[in-house]
């Protein structure tokens, strides 16, 4: 079975597009081959800045012959019907078969579609793939109609086996497929022929091209950390930058340079961001001082002077970039010292947050008031929380954040310290944006928590108020992320703040003049939205959706910390034998009771009387229910849900014995009513802990 090698050679492909392009090439080609009837053993996709490559092993040499039988009209059907059948099959009358079935003689057409050779199918699939390739952006060049991310220069398409290799014949917009490629643009630009994937990969290596992006990443990181270690330094990890740089070079050459002394006083985040965004440099720190003192750059070629000229040029460009950063830093510090952070924030009055939600200054005023209300609920000083909220977004007007928006919050914390504000306020300037995602750090300082909650809840309340809610996959204002942030802030800090109590004042601050709206529906919708995000969060931790629903049905479900404690205890309980068996007993009791109440048109909730107990099983269940009630109440009061579940578990054996020996629907009406009331007691006792009717199974 032959192996297939495809290389699409072009001008430089943007690094950010390469990983997706590899997967798209693999999927489009292999899916197309399979749809055409070919099979294969394995496939792998690779990329460098100038080439997309696909290797398919164990490809079948041709597609199978397909035989299709189609049933037609009766043999004595009108001529028009038979003619229509012939047209649909492409056969003549003499090629039809006549077979007997229950309805008599029927015409059948047997259509055989011969297999096609692999080269023909590959050419067809590859042309379709190239013409329909889903680049985020593409271009045309010259006079052709072909579109590609950058001008496509050559196509290598080769089928090879033990007998040799053959070029797949195809021509596309003047490009004819061949068996040759180029090496490194500068170090080995000559073309060379290949006979298969292993030969291709080996010759590329000798031509200074490292084909596998993951190998380039490993080589870059290994060499960078080795050079840093030799000087007692450490490279700051940056997985995204490493992936991007690996997509910029075919033959990585790691070089380390020094940062000018004039710039070492800049905040490390500024140095790292400037070097990463503008130069694609890695930052290198001195563990002894904690400062970023050097940088690592990755060249795409070896040079006779071992990179000295490259480092010199990079150093000049870096100095210019860092001079700009230093200017921004010093200019911002002067503003802070003369006008303070609140003075810096004055410009936010002219910055629109949303045309229906006011300016950034309006938003800050709402967050300040809300942070003051939330502060006591999370153990923070109301005055400090209000002060932090007032200045937390001041750095949005700074020159540094204007140049590097990703430093918002970080620069605010530096400027707050420069202004002499309390450390809790400085920390809140940075931390109030967190958490930004499911794995981001969660603030724990009370002032930071208060401002972070106020920021996110104001955003949610505002957009909910104006009807800008997430729909399907669309969430332009990142409201799902904001809701998850609120959830993680409350849970991580074990906060007992009730969402309903926070959301109402947040909604009220979005009142427009003469607005008399009832916010209750908005609050309930928003609380339901929080519950949906909480379900996703807890499912990722292994808690089933029905367990969460059983706890959501209980009072106080806007206290997320209490809700999660209950869900965790119930989840653990249901994984035990006692939990599983009690659930079955509860469901049996609930089903019998529900059916009886529907049939009789009454509710059996008047309390069972022990004096009507006729059997030991009934008397034992009475005693067990009394004991459970006495234990569950204090346990729930203490929020010890594990103890409440344990008390509920003690009902398992008495309930089992009751159903084994007692007929609930007795002929005696008094006994029947008493026993149904007892089933209600079982349901009511369990319902104090969780709504078990929502549990599946």
Curated annotation (Swiss-Prot):
GO molecular function terms noted in the UniProt entry: arginine-tRNA ligase activity; ATP binding; glycine-tRNA ligase activity
GO cellular component: cytosol
InterPro entries from the UniProt entry: DALR_anticod-bd, Gly-tRNA-synth_bsu, Gly-tRNA-synth_heterodimer
Keywords assigned: Aminoacyl-tRNA synthetase, ATP-binding, Cytoplasm, Ligase, Nucleotide-binding, Protein biosynthesis
Location of the protein in the cell: Cytoplasm
Catalysed transformations (reactions): tRNA(Gly) + glycine + ATP = glycyl-tRNA(Gly) + AMP + diphosphate
EC number(s) from the headed UniProt entry: 6.1.1.14
Any single GO BP term: arginyl-tRNA aminoacylation
HAMAP family xrefs: Gly_tRNA_synth_beta (MF_00255)
Family, as annotated: Belongs to the class-II aminoacyl-tRNA synthetase family.
Listed PANTHER family: GLYCINE--TRNA LIGASE, CHLOROPLASTIC_MITOCHONDRIAL 2 (PTHR30075:SF2), GLYCYL-TRNA SYNTHETASE (PTHR30075)
Subunit structure: Tetramer of two alpha and two beta subunits.
Protein name as catalogued: Glycine--tRNA ligase beta subunit
Organism: Cereibacter sphaeroides (strain ATCC 17029 / ATH 2.4.9)
Designated gene of the protein: glyS
